[in-house]
């Protein structure tokens, strides 16, 4: 069990009656026995972070062992927060084990000081919150898209609302209560699968807030079969909205088995678009990991690489 001392005091406001964030606050609780625990650093938890835009959900903030509340830290916002730290608490017995990978890298000087904000998904809303609304608005009416809307989205597309929750409610609360660097050069997004899609979308929609993103195993196809419609909508959007070269950084990758085996064509199209638009290494990277699949164990095994990309110490 991690001892909680000298933790930053986090707060979220009661939003009942339209009350603005900051009007009232509640301290987070320590994780219970059935919730995520960490082996390195400290974890603080809002059991239900309130929002005017999306349903309330748990949010956890990981503080590295060196965090003392005085030195400003970069902030990495990660999606699917319930899968980030503790395999004993997840539905599939796997986790990213972010604390175990990041803490020794920070201690060794391989990464700048940073904290992680793990945003839990709401399973019933995950596709609706992570599928970019701009993609959805551009989809043609076809059997593929009709099936996707009926079977996956199931409701109105909530990704714009989800990003507003992060930018307008969650980030101000974290910045107010933790020692953070608040500029875009220290504020990043990371996710896998659908979380990769929303991370890239967030980078494009809020370039003044997020300076870089990492998208692992990006689920460009939307469903479980290759299709042309959803990748085409993504490409058209990226052509319009991706920040100009030199004004953003983006890490992408994929494996070659399981669902990741279906991403080769779409990811190749995205890679070609990046080159066409003038985005080149080292500011934009796309990597392939042979033999790796679509699961937390795979993402954990290569997590050090996107962490270095996002958080390499400043010269």
For the regions a language model picked out, list residue spans one by one:
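Non-catalytic cap/lid and distal C-terminal segments of serine-dependent acyl enzymes
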Residues: 30-315
């Amino acid at each position: 069990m991690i001892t909680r001392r000298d933790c930053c005091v986090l707060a979220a406001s009661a939003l009942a009656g339209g009350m603005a964030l900051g009007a009232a606050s509640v301290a987070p609780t320590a994780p219970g026995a059935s919730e995520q625990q960490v082996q390195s650093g400290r974890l603080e938890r809002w059991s239900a972070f309130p929002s005017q835009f999306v349903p309330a959900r748990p949010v956890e903030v990981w503080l590295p062992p060196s965090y003392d509340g005085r030195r400003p830290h970069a902030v990495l916002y990660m999606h699917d927060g319930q899968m980030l730290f503790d395999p004993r608490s997840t539905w599939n017995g796997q986790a990213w084990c972010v604390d175990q990978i990041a803490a020794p890298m920070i201690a060794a000087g391989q990464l700048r000081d940073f904290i992680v904000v793990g945003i839990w998904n709401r399973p019933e809303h995950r596709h609706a919150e992570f599928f970019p609304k701009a993609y959805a608005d551009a989809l043609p009416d076809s059997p593929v898209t009709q099936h996707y809307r009926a079977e996956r989205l199931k409701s109105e597309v909530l990704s714009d609302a989800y990003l507003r929750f992060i930018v307008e409610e969650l980030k101000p609360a974290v910045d107010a209560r933790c020692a953070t660097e608040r500029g875009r050069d220290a504020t990043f997004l990371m996710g896998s699968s659908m979380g990769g899609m929303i991370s890239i979308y967030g980078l494009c929609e809020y370039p003044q807030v997020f300076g870089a993103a990492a998208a692992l195993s990006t689920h460009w196809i939307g469903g479980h079969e290759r299709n042309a419609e959803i990748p085409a909508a993504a490409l058209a959007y990226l052509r319009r909205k991706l920040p100009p070269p030199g004004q953003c950084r983006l890490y992408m990758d994929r494996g070659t088995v399981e669902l990741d085996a279906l991403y080769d064509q779409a990811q190749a199209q995205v890679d070609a678009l990046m080159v066409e638009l003038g985005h080149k290494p080292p500011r934009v990277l796309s990597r392939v990991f042979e033999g790796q699949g679509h699961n937390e164990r795979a993402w954990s095994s290569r997590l050090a690489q996107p962490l270095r990309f996002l958080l390499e110490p400043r010269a």
